[in-house]
Structures are given as C-alpha cells and as structure tokens.
C-alpha cells in the first residue's frame, strides 16, 4: 500500500516537473537550454509564449518586482516565474491524472458491457 502511494507520488512529481520545464522553457524563456535559464531568469523580461498570450505581462512583472524592497527584488524576480511554473506543472499533473482515471473508467465500463 505504501509502495503504491509512493509510486503515485513519483508519477505526480514527474508530471509536475514536466509541466514546470514546459512552462519555463516555452512560456517564460522561449528556450530549453537549461544552462541559460539562470542568466535568463535574472533578466527583467519574459520572452516566451506568455508574452503573446498576455501582452502586458512584462509591465506587470517589472512593476511587481520594483514595488518590493531592494533586498527582496531578486528573490521576487525568481519566485514569480518559478511559482507560475510550479502552478502550471501541478495543473498538468492534475489533468494527466484526470485523463488516466477517465480512460481507466471507460476501459472498465467497456469490459462490463460484454
């Protein structure tokens, strides 16, 4: 029972990580070269797909960072994209779990009819 829960947790964390990588790579930075991510996250602007979806995201991002105390600006600057990435990853994991349970239900239902 514990092993089954650990496996489910590992699968959930895998999907969260995949969603996080997709968000940071595609939506925020527009690159999957992870060696560049630290330097690109240190810049003030998002450059990925999120700029097309929400055109004023960079203005909001700069305004939010500038409102913080000087000591916390760098911290907030990294937490915003990382936080959005984690939320996106959790959403991907939940959607994958829903699809898994839906397919499992449909397969069980199709065998019960026969």
Curated annotation (Swiss-Prot):
It comes from the Bacteria. Coiled coil: none annotated. The chain crosses the membrane at residues 9-29, 75-95. The keyword Ubl conjugation does not apply. Its main location: membrane. The keyword Transmembrane helix applies. GO terms for cellular component: plasma membrane. Keywords: Cell membrane, Membrane, Transmembrane, Transmembrane helix. It is found in: Cell membrane. It is a multi-pass membrane protein. This is Uncharacterized protein MG267 homolog. It comes from Mycoplasma pneumoniae (strain ATCC 29342 / M129 / Subtype 1) (Mycoplasmoides pneumoniae).
